Amino acid sequence: MTDRAPHYGLLGLLQTPTQPPKDNPPKLPEKQRRRGRDTTRNRRLFASDGPTDEEGPEVPEIPPSDEEKENRPEPLPVVENGWHSFLRETLEHQLGRLQREVNQDFEDLYRRLGIHP
């Protein structure tokens, strides 16, 4: 046996090669390190001064005006009308016809192959 990496075929081309971890990441200059510390400290100091975006101020719910009520379209009632039954019957008929065609095709294929179900 050899100590080679496993071969994944074309899938191996899609995987990114792994790099060994770096022992010591480069250090930032002192000024940038201080700046980073200062901003995190300032964020912690001033975090409780006001509402955050998540909380937001409470806004009372305003009822819609008469004009908005007039412009709002009326919801369509969902009832079993003639179109629904017509569409359902048509779809049932088409599905039944397709099922018969598929069954006939399979019977023909079985017959050609000499398979008797």
Curated annotation (Swiss-Prot):
Cellular compartments annotated: Host cytoplasm; Host nucleus
Subunit structure: Assembles into oligomeric complexes. Interacts with host CDK1. Interacts with host SRPK1; this interaction may favor expression of late viral transcripts. Interacts with host cytokeratin components KRT8 and KRT18.
Protein name: Protein E4
Gene Ontology BP terms: symbiont-mediated arrest of host cell cycle during G2/M transition
UniProt keywords, alphabetically: Early protein, Host cytoplasm, Host G2/M cell cycle arrest by virus, Host nucleus, Host-virus interaction, Modulation of host cell cycle by virus, Phosphoprotein
Principal location: host cell
Biased composition annotated in UniProt, kind: Basic and acidic residues: 24-41
One cellular component (GO) term of this entry: host cell cytoplasm
Function: Contributes to multiple aspects of the viral life cycle including viral genome amplification, suppression of suprabasal cell differentiation and egress of newly formed virions. Induces host cell cycle arrest at the G2 phase by associating with and preventing the nuclear entry of host CDK1/cyclin B1 complexes. Inhibits cellular DNA replication by preventing loading of host replication licensing proteins MCM2 and MCM7 onto chromatin. Within the cytoplasm, associates with host kinase SRPK1, a splicing factor regulator, and inhibits its activity.
Posttranslational mods: Phosphorylated by host ERK. The phosphorylation triggers a structural change that enhances keratin binding and protein stability.
